[in-house]
Structures are given as structure tokens and as C-alpha cells.
């Protein structure tokens, strides 16, 4: 399996843009992604999201590193995390909750299914 490399992740042009699946409120955030899905249950990429509140529904484990922006994530079973550029997270499988993006965020990520 070849090595996956994303060059200049802070300015990389992202391929796909769609409104978030479950918005909460009138301002609907738009998520943009460039990613590679491998056949071993791993996806990696660069993801960006505009301001807004929405429900996270991804059930995979995720490691991510925030390149820019500011937001909070409130897991269904935990306390609010305040996240900004330079922070990294490792979310266990089934980490459901509410994203609140205050300033457009961009992150690199790895999903493990």
C-alpha cells in the first residue's frame, strides 16, 4: 500500500463541499474535504468547516490535528472541549455530540473504521 501525502494542508484546495448533515440552527455550516479511503478501513484527509452548529454522527475512531480556526465540541456524555489551531484530538468510536464552529476550522484527520 502506498504512502499517502497531503502537501501544504493549510492552503490545499479541497475537492468536495456540502452542507453538514444535521445542522442545528439557521446558519448551516458547509464542510469541505479532500480524502483518501483505503481498503483496510482507514480514511485520511483534510477537512474544513464554516461557522455553525451541528450534530456529529461519525461512529469511527478519529485522530485529528487542527490547522486553523476555533470551535467547541460537546460529547453526549462529557464536558465541552474548547479547540483552536494547534490542538489535536483522539476520539474513540461512537463519540457523538455537538460541534459549534465559531471561526472556520481546518484539520487533518484519520478515521479508523
What are these model-predicted stretches?
Residues 50, 79, 95, 104-105:
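A generic "binding-loop/recognition-motif" signal
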Residues 49, 58-73:
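Short, conserved beta-strand element in jelly-roll/cupin
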Residues 45-46, 54-59, 75, 81-82, ...:
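Short histidine-centered beta-strand/loop micro-motifs
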Residues 1-41:
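A short, N-terminal "cap"/entry segment at the start of jelly-roll beta-barrel domains
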Amino acid at each position: 500500500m502506498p504512502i499517502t501525502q497531503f502537501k501544504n494542508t493549510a492552503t490545499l484546495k479541497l475537492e468536495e463541499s456540502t452542507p453538514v448533515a444535521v445542522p442545528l440552527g439557521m446558519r448551516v455550516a458547509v464542510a469541505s474535504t479532500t480524502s483518501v479511503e483505503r481498503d483496510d478501513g482507514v480514511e485520511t484527509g483534510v477537512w474544513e468547516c464554516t461557522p455553525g452548529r451541528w450534530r456529529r454522527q461519525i461512529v469511527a475512531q478519529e485522530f485529528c490535528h487542527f490547522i486553523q480556526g476555533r470551535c467547541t465540541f460537546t460529547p453526549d456524555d462529557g464536558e465541552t472541549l474548547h479547540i483552536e489551531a494547534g490542538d489535536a484530538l483522539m476520539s474513540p468510536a461512537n463519540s457523538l455530540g455537538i460541534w459549534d464552529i465559531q471561526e472556520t476550522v481546518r484539520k487533518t484527520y484519520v478515521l479508523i473504521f
